[in-house]
């Protein structure tokens, strides 16, 4: 049985773990009955400068079921919704344009479902892009296709990796899990204002690419999608410019 417990308030000056387990006991959860404890959120209440508090939300896997109706802070945890499904056309190639967050996670999902994502990116892979960007900062000579805006990871690669969204989606947990698996700090999963950090973000992007490749995906960098060929309201082909050779196909 998995349950969530919210609004656990602990003074910043107290032993956090000890106080959390005290609150769990008050809500019918003994330490002996806990199989696993996971932080879902941690925020700070700093309205009173002399009494700053942490506020926690936890997910707890219990060894034995308990009666949730007795405790207002407890609720049944949601089941995983991002299940794997069978591909309609397994091993079919699907084009993905761009390696920003949308492109990378689209490619990952397609690969998980058994498709072969073919990813086209006008810029360079992240390590080469970083060298090109440093060269631009030093010389002011711009590579129009690989720079601070374009290249693996998208424009956000040179941000501090803040993880903001205005939507409430059940898939956010999946995204965070993938980021952590690819090298992000586990704290992003439960911090109120999570961010990865620029240096770590580059590692995460590279590892995410390698995971997609391990599932059968293919990446073509320095490949600019110039146009889309449409016939009878169906996409038939992509027109690609190979940036280095200037060849079109």
Where are these regions (language model features)?
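Extreme N-terminal leader/targeting segments of oxidoreductases
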Residues: 1-92
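Conserved N-terminal/central alpha/beta ligand/cofactor-binding core
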Residues: 4, 49-51, 128, 134-219, ...
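A conserved short coil-to-beta-strand element within the FAD-binding core of flavoproteins
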Residues: 38-44, 221-236
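Beta1/beta-strand and adjacent pyrophosphate-binding region of the FAD-binding site
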Residues: 87-102, 118-120
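Aromatic pocket-lining residues of Rossmann-like dinucleotide-binding sites
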Residues: 109-110
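Short beta-strand "acidic-cap" motif of Rossmann-like dinucleotide-binding folds
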Residues: 115-122, 126
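Core beta-strand elements of the Rossmann-like FAD/NAD(P) dinucleotide-binding domain
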Residues: 243-249
């Amino acid at each position: 049985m998995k349950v969530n417990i919210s609004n656990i308030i602990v003074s910043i000056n107290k032993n956090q773990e000890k106080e959390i387990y005290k609150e769990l006991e008050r809500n019918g959860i003994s330490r002996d009955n806990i199989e696993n404890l996971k932080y879902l959120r941690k925020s700070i209440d700093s309205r009173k400068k002399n009494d700053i508090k942490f506020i926690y939300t936890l997910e707890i896997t219990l060894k034995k079921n308990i009666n949730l109706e007795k405790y207002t802070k407890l609720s049944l945890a949601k089941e995983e919704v991002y299940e794997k499904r069978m591909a309609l056309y397994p091993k079919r190639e699907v084009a993905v344009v761009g390696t920003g967050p949308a492109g990378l996670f689209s490619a990952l999902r397609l690969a998980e479902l058994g498709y072969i994502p073919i990813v086209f990116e006008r810029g360079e892979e992240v390590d080469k892009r970083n060298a090109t960007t440093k060269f631009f900062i030093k010389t002011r000579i711009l590579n129009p296709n690989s720079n601070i805006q374009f290249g693996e990871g998208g424009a956000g690669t040179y941000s501090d990796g803040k993880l903001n969204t205005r939507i409430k989606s059940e898939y956010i947990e999946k995204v965070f899990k993938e980021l952590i698996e690819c090298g992000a700090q586990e704290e992003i999963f439960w911090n109120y204002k999570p961010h990865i950090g620029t240096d770590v973000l580059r590692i995460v992007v590279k590892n995410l690419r390698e995971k997609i490749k391990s599932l059968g995906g293919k990446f073509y960098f320095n490949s600019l999608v110039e146009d889309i060929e449409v016939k009878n309201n169906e996409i038939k082909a992509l027109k690609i410019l190979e940036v280095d050779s200037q060849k079109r196909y």
